[in-house]
Amino acid sequence: MLKKNTEAAATPVASEVIDVDFCVIGAGSGGLSFAAAAAAFGQKVVLIEKHKMGGDCLNYGCVPSKALLAAGKRAHYMRTSAKFGIVPVEPIVDAKAVHGHVQDVIASIAPNDSVERFTGLGVRVITAAGRFIDKKTVEAGGHRITARRFIIATGSSPVVPPDRKSVV
C-alpha cells in the first residue's frame, strides 16, 4: 500500500539514491505493461512491488478464475453432450486436481511477469512497499527513488455499495 510519510523526522536514512525516468509502483497488469514499454523505449525504470509480481490478476483473480471456469466448462460439456450424439456422464470432480490445474496455469504465465524477465528488460525491480517522502521521492527497500514521473499502478479493491434491501 502506498502511503504518504507524515513522520519525516522518523524516516530512516536510505542506503542508495536511484534517479530514473519512471518509477512504477505496483507490478500488476498495468504496472508491468508500462514498465516494459518504457524500458523498450530506452527509459530508465524502477518497478516497486510489495507482494507478488503479476499482482492480483495473475495470482488471485483473472488467471485463477479463468482456469476454474475452464474446468467447470469441461464438466458442463460432459453433462450436456447428448445433443451431439455422445452419451452424457456426470463428471467426478477431483478438487485437489482442479487446484493443481489452477496452480499449473499460474506457473505457466508467471515467467512473463517475473523479476528475472523485467531485470532482463532493463527494469530495476525492488521488492518492498513504497512510500512517498516528498513529491519527487519514493522510499522503498532502503532506497530513495527520484523520478521525472511516477506511475501509481497499485490496483483497486471492489466496493459493493449498500442498497438498503439486500446489502447493508
Question: What is the role of each PLM region?
Answer:
Residues 1-20, 29, 36-43, 48-168:
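Glycine-rich flavin
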Residues 26:
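Class I SAM-dependent methyltransferase core
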